[in-house]
Amino acid sequence: GIDHMSAAELIQRIKNNHGVVKSFESYGGGLPAHDTLSNPFKYVISWNPRNVVMAGEKGAQYIENGNVKIIPYHNVFRHTWSLDVPGLGLMEAYPNRDSLYYQQQYGFEEADTVIRGTIRYPGWSETWYNVVRLGLPNENLTIPNLKERTFAELTEMFLPANGSNGGDIEQRVANFLHISPTGQIMEKMRWLGLFSSEKIGIDAETPAEVMTHLISQKLKLRDDARDMVV
């Protein structure tokens, strides 16, 4: 809500001074403070965890220099911008849902650039892009008896039937995604618990519910940590 309120105030001020909005770009996000980063994702859950898991599921669109750009779900986290944020340094942003909707809501149809984006620390989008490629943020598939299955067994379900050229599950996931088995993306997936032999142990029905549980547990805001709004 902070981004909407500040945008509305700024736009009204421009209109009151007989100005015209020709370009509007807004980037925001809730993040852990830089001096309290405590996990490889450099992120903590400070709002609805389901919304974090399902971010980008409906794709995104925006307008840039008069051209409408449509980003399908599987490419949202691959379509990023680098931002130099004062006091934080280089951050990344990905497109946030339907920016064209806000062009109408804010009342500047004459603008030829309207972009709303979500800010994350560098590396988030690259990792989540591969989580999406695996298919784990899915709330349409109902899987029986998930409670008694392991996290590794759930991940295994999303691999091709041919086993992705053999090896253990980590190697097969890396082969399937065409990424390094020893790189940072795999390290983050491992840390999150996607290859764990531990039972899921909750009354989940969908992969998305399992992912929501995982990030709720692993990406908690510590008692001694601080979050911030950018």
Segment roles from a protein language model:
Residues 13-230:
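C-terminal catalytic/substrate-binding lobe primarily of soluble NAD(P)-dependent oxidoreductases
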Residues 1-6:
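Short alpha-helices
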Residues 7-11:
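Buried hydrophobic packing segments
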